[in-house]
Amino acid sequence: MNYAKISQVAHYAPRQVVSNDDLAEIMDTSDEWISSRTGIKNRHLSSDETTSDLATKVAENLLQKSGISAQDLDFIIVATITPDSLMPSAAARVQANIGAKNAFAFDLTAACSGFIFALSTGEKFISSGRYQKGLVIGSETLSKTVDWSDRSTAVLFGDGAGGVLLESASEQHFLAESQFTDGSRGDSLTCGKIGLSSPFSEKGENQPYLTMDGRAIFDFAIRDVARSIKETIESSQLSAEDLDFLLLHQANIRILDKMAKKLGVAREKLPANMMEYGNTSAASIPILLSECVEQGLIKLNGNQTILMSGFGGGLTWGTLIVTI
């Protein structure tokens, strides 16, 4: 049998930090209004770095930490909804930037579930026995997608990237997974709608900005996502008590509070960093994982059992249980 494992982690955020007070100077909001409803205090915003630039920093960090050459990589997957361009992909740009000439590379679009979907995909590549090493990165520059006159969305999002090195292993580390999509509810969270514009079509509508039905997304997370997490835990033949940490998409502190109660786990098992990053979509889980390793909460090769769960646009949601 062929198995995959997470052997290294890394993250990167733009230097510019924008606080709630900074936002209050350009829109009708306040630190109290934002933090009491979301838990967010700050977010990193790019001034000149693209999504592929952020992802490249993560890739370089992963290679430096692991001591492997870029030419040893078999694949690079970048989960993002904010690529530099429709083509070439952000992953292709990363491949060129780091000189990973032997790696195939592609982007995966599943919004805030993107890293989970991408990590599952990378695990399948390695478990096939055909590939040995790959990078899975979540990278976003969401600051270019928000309407900065809309306080209901502009205050929520930030820019950043995080990722992991996947390598072949002799023992099983990916214990259970579940992935879902419900396109019938897709209009509750949208971004980057591109209308038809050829000489042979009616002019379509363009909607470049992110739009969200906040209540619908909150209810979706507490209901559908919580249920799927419970089912994934059950399928692994583990209990919630067996999990060392649950790394959930960093959308809202209230979601984490309610999730802990619904799942019957100590709130301390759900670390949070949206206070400093805001919602970074596909980047949120790998950034959180990398910070937990930096802080010593999670130890690489420490045989800890970690649940990761993402949820967002599509609607999409997915959960992985792994040992690290």
Swiss-Prot record:
Domain of life: Bacteria
Protein name in the entry: Beta-ketoacyl-[acyl-carrier-protein] synthase III
Family under the similarity heading: Belongs to the thiolase-like superfamily. FabH family.
Active site residues of this protein: C112, H249, N279
Lineage per the UniProt record: Bacteria, Bacillati, Bacillota, Bacilli, Lactobacillales
Enzyme class, broadest EC rank: transferase
UniProt keyword terms in alphabetical order: Acyltransferase, Cytoplasm, Fatty acid biosynthesis, Fatty acid metabolism, Lipid biosynthesis, Lipid metabolism, Multifunctional enzyme, Transferase
GO molecular function: 3-oxoacyl-[acyl-carrier-protein] synthase activity; beta-ketoacyl-acyl-carrier-protein synthase III activity
Catalytic activity: malonyl-[ACP] + acetyl-CoA + H(+) = 3-oxobutanoyl-[ACP] + CO2 + CoA
Signal sequence coordinates: none
Assembly mode: Homodimer.
Pathway assignment: Lipid metabolism; fatty acid biosynthesis
Cellular location(s): Cytoplasm
Pfam families reported for this sequence: ACP_syn_III (PF08545), ACP_syn_III_C (PF08541)
Predominant location: cytoplasm
Enzyme Commission number(s) from the entry: 2.3.1.180
Domain writeup: The last Arg residue of the ACP-binding site is essential for the weak association between ACP/AcpP and FabH.
